[in-house]
Amino acid sequence: MLKLSMSRRAATGLAMTAAMTLSGAAFAPAFAETATSAVWQGLHKDIFGGREVLDAKDMISMDAPIRAEDAAVVPITIKMPASFAANVKSLTLVVDQNPSPVVAAIKYGAAAGTGDRMLSTRIRMDQYSDVRAIAETNDGKLYMISKFVKASGGCSAPAAKDAEEAAKSLGKMQIKKFVSKEGDALTAEAQFMIKHPNTTGMQMDQVTGLYTPARYVNKIEVKSGADVIFSMEGGISISEDPNFRFTHGGKASDVIEVKAEDSDGASFAGQLAPSQS
């Protein structure tokens, strides 16, 4: 399935190159937007089996830059109102033109909360592309919102940190919690960052001229007390030092716990007790 998606995007890339040559670079952004929409047709089938995807413009909002300052660190924030979020069981983030289009597949748990829902992270972008958020509700329906973002080169951009320095801090976590009360309901936000190079396999070592092997965080589970807030499966499209900020439920006295694994099989864990908030 992934091979099928890659071949479709390769064909689209050749068409884009030809069009830019004939029509001029001034038309490239508009053509890129059209091309990425065409790529989505194949991804839609590969990822969701061609199931109907409904317009979520009144139920999901996405905050992302029109033009990113750094294609290796593109901030995106997804928000859903409580009335809709209560029925959402999963969220999939997709960048059409990335070598690995599925950025993250997120499953919500019992501690996801009953209020407005928010998830913020940072992603890599290889080319100008639509960025999509697709929510699945408990009745199996899919709802999508998308935004076209101008950014390129993020998947092959050199790491921000020296490899030896990154190795020393590999897996270390920083976790923060933000709590506020609204009436009788507790609304909370938390944030964590995992020190990890999240290499893509497309980055060249400037000294050796060789490509750095891919190594990335591919599994994350976040809990409030004994209950899961969300679990995630990810890939190379998540930025270096994966960073997530999110809303959640649970009790103010709960410990926030984060467990993660990477593609080399290494495991990492961290937690934040209420006294540390």
Question: What is each model feature region?
Answer:
Residues 33-161, 176-185, 191-277:
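A general "mature secreted/periplasmic domain" signal
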Residues 20-29:
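C-terminal segment of classical bacterial N-terminal signal peptides
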Residues 17-21, 137:
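Short stretches within intrinsically disordered, low-complexity N-terminal or propeptide regions
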Residues 169-175:
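Terminal interaction module
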Residues 8-10, 26, 227:
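Intrinsically disordered, low-complexity serine/threonine-rich segments
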Residues 163-165:
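N-terminal helix-cap/turn-to-beta initiation motif at the start of protein domains
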Residues 1-18:
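N-terminal secretory signal peptides and thylakoid transit peptides that target proteins
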Residues 167-169, 204:
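Non-catalytic macromolecular-recognition regions in eukaryotic signaling proteins
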